[in-house]
Amino acid sequence: PERYDVIVFKNPNDGKQNYIKRLIGLPGDNLLIENGDIYVMDEVDGEYEKSITRKPPEKLKNVLQAVDDTNHIGELLNDVQWPSRWQAFDGSKQWTTDATGENPVFRSSAQPDAHWLRYRHYQPFKNEWSTISSGLLPTRFRNNSLPPGRLIGDQYGYNDGVYQNNEALVSTQNLGLHWVGDLGLEFWVDIKSSDGTLMFDVVEGGVHFVCEIDIATGKATLSAQDEASKTKVTFQDASGNPVESPSAKTKINGSGSHHIMYVNADDRLNLWIDNNYVEFDAAAFTWDGIPIPTYSADDPGDAEPAGIAAKNAELDITRIKVLRDLYYTSVKGQGPLGSQISTENETGESISIIEAYHRDPESWSSDGAADFFTAKKGQTEPMFRLEKGETPDKDQFLPMGDNSPRSLDGRVWDGEKFVERDMLIGRAMLIYWPHTLNKPIKYFPNFSRMGFIK
């Protein structure tokens, strides 16, 4: 099997039980989980050198988690006129919003300068839901006040609503305990002009990862604008050589409608146009330090972590989704549900401190925030060592679940943290009976979730 395949295997602690997880570690690997990513550490002259592992594009595409979708805004939020998360926060008139239809349409007029439509992660606080449920907008948004956005965390929608005796054991916000810097942008655009420039970006650690597409020629160019960041980024080609301005040819050729997905994951930029993967001459990159969130009034950075702009081009954006990569946690939680759920983050800080940093961009420049966001980063020793067996059937593999905060996988098993090859059953191929919908009748099949596993 290959890394990031979904595999079925016998539970090492109960040979009668089959497990299904994603394969993360291979025989001979020294593994490190850091910043939500998976690293392999090779020993050189008595010291370990780490290299990030990268999900193949099609596997990456299928594990991305939805953060926001302009076509799916909660009814309660609409009722209180919750502020749009997508706005021209700089006050530019280049962008207008048509809200007359079922879903908003964002329109850009043709202007010589690029003004950005940007995203702020306006997530209701736990104590605001009672106000919203009573039909009122929380006070922080009244009088046309628009505070900075909060950080995007590793929240999983299918972990929401963990209850016992009608009491919430873990609130929604408590299931997003780690800042996720690996973000993506998916949007549907109708380009009205035959030339001009379409631009979009995602931000991590204050670095704007910008993609510019020449509408007339289809040439796409990447850049890492890291002036406001505490770390610097270098693009590298497949041979490890630095590349200043990576580029690629796309199928965009003048006016037309397109579906675009742009994702920063595993220290690589990924672009799909109309479901076709775009190959750049260099899309992988390295950091010269540890990325931490940045914010200033001039450049909100990670408080506005995604954006779309146009220059000398008229276009309509009919739908926008904000996405995030999986975040693999390296802690064994001791929450109210036992080891299956983590109510701490990797710093060991309390939920109140974590929440305070996540929601307050002004605090990100403090020494305390720097210590918080770099805690358990820059480690020099692997966490898991997997052996090649004396015979192939004893080779060791490490499986992990995509729902990392609640996955009972190799990270948290008692005893050995691996599966031997002779316990592997095979690759998972098909979801043939997902959890039923129970409507319009009980046990009604969920046909939309049936399909091949990637």
Please place each PLM-identified region on the residue numbering.
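Extended hydrophobic leader/signal-anchor segments used for secretion and membrane insertion
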Residues: 1-454
